[in-house]
UniProtKB/Swiss-Prot annotation:
Native organism: Homo sapiens
Task performed by this protein: Mutarotase that catalyzes the interconversion of beta-D-galactose and alpha-D-galactose during galactose metabolism. Beta-D-galactose is metabolized in the liver into glucose 1-phosphate, the primary metabolic fuel, by the action of four enzymes that constitute the Leloir pathway: GALM, GALK1 (galactokinase), GALT (galactose-1-phosphate uridylyltransferase) and GALE (UDP-galactose-4'-epimerase). Involved in the maintenance of the equilibrium between the beta- and alpha-anomers of galactose, therefore ensuring a sufficient supply of the alpha-anomer for GALK1.
Catalytic activity: alpha-D-galactose = beta-D-galactose; alpha-D-glucose = beta-D-glucose
Effect recorded for H176A: Decreased activity by 300-fold
Compartments, record wording: Cytoplasm
Pathway(s) served: Carbohydrate metabolism; hexose metabolism; Carbohydrate metabolism; galactose metabolism
Disease in which the protein is involved: Galactosemia 4: A form of galactosemia, an inborn error of galactose metabolism typically manifesting in the neonatal period, after ingestion of galactose, with jaundice, hepatosplenomegaly, hepatocellular insufficiency, food intolerance, hypoglycemia, renal tubular dysfunction, muscle hypotonia, sepsis and cataract. GALAC4 inheritance is autosomal recessive.
GO CC field: cytoplasm; extracellular exosome
Protein name per the record: Galactose mutarotase
Modified residues (N-acetylalanine): A2
């Protein structure tokens, strides 16, 4: 069973409201989540010696999350990942979004779901956040009611996303936590062993928009079906890092997505999801300029993300899994982050 405590985390400037922190604790995990962006700010996991370390990148204070920073721990929406040129059509009508990562719209726009205050509700073993995204927010059509629920069950953090729309709109929600299983202040993730359950991936153009091809991983750097040691793998294939969607083999039911093992500490993260894809990102844009928790700096490759999602730019790619949510339907996806030692 998990316990839940709440406290004030900080005040938004100009009377913007109070940001609260919710601490979820089980015998195996401790997770801190704030109501600003439904953001995971800390996640403590024990190693094989029973010593707990915080394994997510982030900040000790609210100010860190209000500055320009790479979505540490936040919920992303209305549409995670990139939409080509920030435009799409729904039922013949063209919509234009804010361009916040030239020449595309990224992670919901200038003020996405990560940059708003959510309304919390404490549950017996977790916390539920809700908000109404108004019609036209960041250029998206229709009003969207959204619920994000975090629950703790032993060594498992479960994240459920639900949404209902007043008119047809693309919806693709994820969490953008950066993990380092050696501890959040460790300089890199080179010694992490990574497995991703995907036979295919999406090649991208120079602006990181999928080309439309669904390519086999066989014989490429993207074949992560058997464990690879990340640093050596990137070196062997002369890669700058990963920032790609892997197409998962599962159905709409819960299926295995990825496993990451840090041999030195024994920590293991397994990810399961109902989503058809996962963006594996190795912190390629981190540059060491942000000051994180306990004075940590976050250089390139100091954290990895496993962003469970629909495939990027699906609203413009008819052969990708459907991303439109229509009135009367419910968006309902769950991701499980399961921690253990081995």
């Amino acid at each position: 069973m998990a316990s839940v405590t709440r406290a004030v985390f900080g005040e938004l400037p100009s009377g913007g409201g109070t940001v609260e922190k919710f601490q979820l604790q089980s015998d195996l995990l401790r997770v801190d989540i704030i109501s600003w962006g439904c953001t995971i700010t800390a996640l403590e996991v024990k190693d094989r010696q029973g010593r707990a370390s915080d394994v997510v990148l982030g900040f000790a204070e609210l100010e860190g999350y209000l500055q320009k920073q790479p979505y540490f721990g936040a919920v992303i929406g209305r549409v995670a990942n990139r939409i080509a040129k920030g435009t799409f059509k729904v039922d013949g009508k063209e919509y234009h979004l804010a361009i916040n990562k030239e020449p595309n719209s990224l992670h919901g726009g200038v003020r996405g779901f990560d940059k708003v205050l959510w309304t919390p509700r404490v549950l017996s073993n977790g916390v539920q956040f809700s908000r109404i995204s108004p019609d036209g927010e960041e250029g998206y059509p229709g009003e969207l009611k959204v619920w994000v629920t975090y629950t703790l069950d032993g060594g498992e953090l479960i994240v459920n996303y639900r949404a209902q729309a007043s008119q047809a709109t693309p919806v693709n929600l994820t969490n953008h936590s950066y993990f380092n299983l050696a501890g959040q202040a460790s300089p890199n993730i080179n010694d992490h062993e990574v497995t991703i359950e995907a036979d295919t991936y999406l090649p991208v153009d120079e602006t990181l928009i999928p080309t439309g091809e669904v390519a086999p991983v066989q014989g490429t750097a993207f074949d992560l079906r058997k464990p690879v040691e990340l640093g050596k793998h990137l070196q062997d294939f002369h890669l700058n890092g990963f920032d790609h969607n892997f197409c998962l083999k599962g159905s709409k039911e819960k299926h295995f997505c990825a496993r990451v093992h840090h041999a030195a500490s024994g920590r293991v993260l397994e990810v399961y999801t109902t989503q058809p894809g996962v963006q594996f990102y190795t912190g390629n844009f981190l540059d060491g300029t942000l000051k994180g928790k306990n004075g940590a700096v976050y250089p390139k490759h100091s954290g990895f993300c496993l962003e469970t999602q629909n495939w990027p730019d699906a609203v413009n790619q008819p052969r990708f899994p459907p991303v439109l949510l229509r009135p009367g339907e419910e968006y309902d996806h769950t991701t499980w982050f399961k921690f253990s030692v081995a």
